[in-house]
């Protein structure tokens, strides 16, 4: 039985919320399921949020805690420098490192960055990717080796979704709940002269994104409602309620920011709740929406309008898309499959 150090921000809080049934276990990336199965011991370890040298030192010291495997659902390179340096020097060689990479592993912007990246990623035993494209780009850049790389299926906690939302309706409105790099101007323009209802839920600020401009649209159009929300468990649950009641989930993406699996959370939520999806083009997404016949991929306002009209005028077909979406979630994109895949990696090391 191996001891797994689950290293990341807020891990203990997420574990407690998950164990009490307040949130989906998807944010724990399979650690809850692995812990429940009892084949490995999972120790959640919350990284320090202190900035500067103090936080850096604290987080690097955490990586030295007694464990067989370090797991990071988000790879924070600066927090692994010490353990990776020790592994490179022949110390701590028995400690394995596994992480989930959400972007392409680039070569670094300067000499110091390149040195750190090479040190850290050479020390990883397995790097799991959400996107085949990001994985292949990383391999082409030779920042990781083929033996290190593996595609990871990820999705929602279907048992949680079914328990909280046992009945899903098919309302007369479309919903978009994304926070990261969303092109809401384009989406709103598609709805302005259409007799369709749109609900947008997002944060006013999200990292580099500033959605203050949405104030110009609030109360301007009778068919468009815009809500600025905070980050809380209550808000997350409310947004899921709106997704469960909507006709279709919309994922409008800023195309200049599409270099990773942007929008994946919105997509897997929609699939878990059996909803059709209309999304901007994203070649990095692991879900082929049109091939799986669970919705539409669009490129401009004209295509947005066409897809919206089809969903609106063909409710029976829209429901079939939603059924296929849920089926795909059950087969591939769910947290149980994710946990099994990660546990298989742990067992192989």
Language-model features: locations:
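Membrane-proximal helix-turn-helix segments that form the acceptor-binding/catalytic region
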Residues: 61-65, 108-127
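Acidic anion/phosphate-binding donor-loop and adjacent secondary structure
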Residues: 139, 150-171, 185
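Conserved donor-binding/catalytic core segment of Leloir-type glycosyltransferases
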Residues: 166-182, 187-201
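Nucleotide-activated donor-binding/catalytic signature segment of Leloir-type glycosyltransferases, i.e.
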Residues: 202, 211-243
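Nucleotide-sugar-dependent
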Residues: 233-237, 241, 249-268, 279-287
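A short alpha->beta transition loop at the rim of the catalytic pocket in nucleotide-sugar-dependent
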Residues: 247, 274-276
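Conserved acidic donor-binding segment of nucleotide-sugar-dependent glycosyltransferases
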Residues: 291-302, 310-316
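A short, well-ordered alpha-helix in the C-terminal region of glycosyltransferases
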Residues: 310, 317-332, 341-344
């Amino acid at each position: 039985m191996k001891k797994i150090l689950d290293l990341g921000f807020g891990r203990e809080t997420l574990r407690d919320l998950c164990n009490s049934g307040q949130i989906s276990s998807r944010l724990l990336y399979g650690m809850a399921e692995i812990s429940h199965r009892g084949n490995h011991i999972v120790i959640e370890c919350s990284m320090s949020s202190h900035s500067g040298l103090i936080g850096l030192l604290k987080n690097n010291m955490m990586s030295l805690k007694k464990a067989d495997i370090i797991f990071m659902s988000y790879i924070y390179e600066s927090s692994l420098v010490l353990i990776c340096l020790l592994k490179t020097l022949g110390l701590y060689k028995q400690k394995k490192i596994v992480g989930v990479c959400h972007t392409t592993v680039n070569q670094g912007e300067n000499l110091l960055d390149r040195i750190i990246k090479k040190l850290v990623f050479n020390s990883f035993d397995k790097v799991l990717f959400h996107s085949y494209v990001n994985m292949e780009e990383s391999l082409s850049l030779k920042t990781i080796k083929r033996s290190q790389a593996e595609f990871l299926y990820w999705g929602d906690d279907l048992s949680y979704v079914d328990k909280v939302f046992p009945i899903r309706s098919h309302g007369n409105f479309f919903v978009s709940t994304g926070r990261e790099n969303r092109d809401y101007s384009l989406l709103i323009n598609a709805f302005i002269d259409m007799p369709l209802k749109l609900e947008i839920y997002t944060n006013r600020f999200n990292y580099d994104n500033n959605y203050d401009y949405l104030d110009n649209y609030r109360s301007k159009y009778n068919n468009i409602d815009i809500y600025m929300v905070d980050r809380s468990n209550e808000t997350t649950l409310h947004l899921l309620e709106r997704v469960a009641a909507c006709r279709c989930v919309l994922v409008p993406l800023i195309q200049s920011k599409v270099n990773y699996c942007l929008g994946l959370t919105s997509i897997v939520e929609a699939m878990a709740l059996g909803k059709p999806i209309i999304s901007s083009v994203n070649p990095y997404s692991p879900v082929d929406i049109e091939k799986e016949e669970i919705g539409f991929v669009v490129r401009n306002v004209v295509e947005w309008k066409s897809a919206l009209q089809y969903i609106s005028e063909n409710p029976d077909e829209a429901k079939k898309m939603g059924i296929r979406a849920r089926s795909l979630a059950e087969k591939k994109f769910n947290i149980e499959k994710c946990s099994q895949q990660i546990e298989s990696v742990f067992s192989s090391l």
